[in-house]
Amino acid sequence: MAIKAIHARQIFDSRGNPTVEVDVTTAKGLFRAAVPSGASTGVHEALELRDGPPGYMGKGVLKAVANVNSQIAPNLIKSGINVTDQAAVDKFMLDLDGTPNKEKLGANAILGVSLAXCKAGAAEKGLPLYKYIATLAGNKEVIMPVPSFNVINGGSHAGNKLAMQEFMIMPTGASSFTEAMKIGSEVYHNLRAVIKSKYGLDACNVGDEGGFAPSIQDNLEGLELLRTAIDKAGYTGKVXIAMDCAASEFYKEGKYDLDFKNPKSQASSWITSDAMADVYKKMMSTYPIVSIEDPFDQDDWPAWTKLTGECKIQIVGDDLTVTNPLRVQKAIDQKACNCLLLKVNQIGSVSESIKACKMAQEAGWGVMVSHRSGETEDNFIADLVVGLRTGQIKTGAPCRSERLAKYNQLLRIEEDLGGAAKYAGENFRRP
């Protein structure tokens, strides 16, 4: 079925910044998608087209909206491409753009159309979105993911002094996604009580992704808070810990500055890649850490390869790989990590996201589907993680509606699957 109409508009994300929303209309109805945006962005990501000053602090997206309405819409409609041919829809837009990083039309323009068209394709096929995505990826079975709840926020996501960006809990010992949500919620509320009693009510303010942002600087203190909350909730042994260090954010002149939020940070206290690796090893030996994301700068390749070779846990590439098949292949060749963080807006289309996922899975890697810190109520990635059967998702704390939109959709999907639902659990790396 051909596309009848495409219309884009400027809306707002969870940080109050403009973003792109796209409506695709077919004979089956209107299908809407909104594009997320990151705070800690990799330099190798596809280009998110912004208007620049003066309006909206330079973050307006009217250029991207205009590119959808005046360039993508008329040309894609005229092409007559069937909305169920996702690869053709995406290739048409990539060819129309003609640049390696989508800088002409904007990745945010292309992705909005790609996501909306995927929803339209599912309706055309009469399938739930997660099952349609599974068919696009060639998967006969689907799996419910382990949620990685970001419950303590630091780095560029919070106004505290914590260098590392995300301290997460993973209910790997749950028997279903529904139970994982119960565990996540209970640990979260126990964590709030622990933080309140130790640092006061002010410390219970939350960051961009719904996690708490207590005014602490010691990363080990953050991990200790998690361990205490897990124990108080009664889930020791059922909940593992994951981290996103976002180390590119505190990489300076070849070293790592764990006090990077302090404008008077002393260069003499910055540490080498090897010393940084020792910090991680100490954490791993003390806490039930099963996954570390972006432990080093996005171009500090030797450090990545060395750590991945030395430890057994999951090492996740985000800024390193930016969901880009070329970067993923380089990381595979150099054995730089063993898990891909999949963010649809880093690469800018559904088809390329599926390609990057399949490439990682075929290399024996894990894949974790991820939100961005600037999110909307769109819940596409919930269906994506089930359809691609990656077994793990991170989309914030069990707090803030733009985060719960994804988790609630996963609850609906598990209900829809009924007795056929399988939870990845402790096999989240290779479900």
Swiss-Prot record:
The cofactors it requires, by name, are: Mg(2+)
Record-given protein name: Enolase
* Keywords on record: Cytoplasm, Glycolysis, Lyase, Magnesium, Metal-binding
- InterPro entries attached here? Enolase, Enolase-like_C_sf, Enolase-like_N, Enolase_C, Enolase_CS, Enolase_N
Instruction: State the organism named in the record.
Output: Fasciola hepatica
- EC numbers listed for it are 4.2.1.11
* Compartments in which it is found: Cytoplasm
Per UniProt, the enzyme's principal EC class comes to: lyase
User: Which residues bind Mg(2+) per the record?
Assistant: D244, E293, D318
Q: Which domain of life is it from?
A: Eukaryota
* Gene Ontology MF: a single term: phosphopyruvate hydratase activity
- Alphabetized CDD domains for the sequence: enolase (cd03313)
Q: Where does substrate bind?
A: H157, E166, E293, D318, S370, H371, R372, S373, K394
Q: Which reaction does it catalyse?
A: (2R)-2-phosphoglycerate = phosphoenolpyruvate + H2O
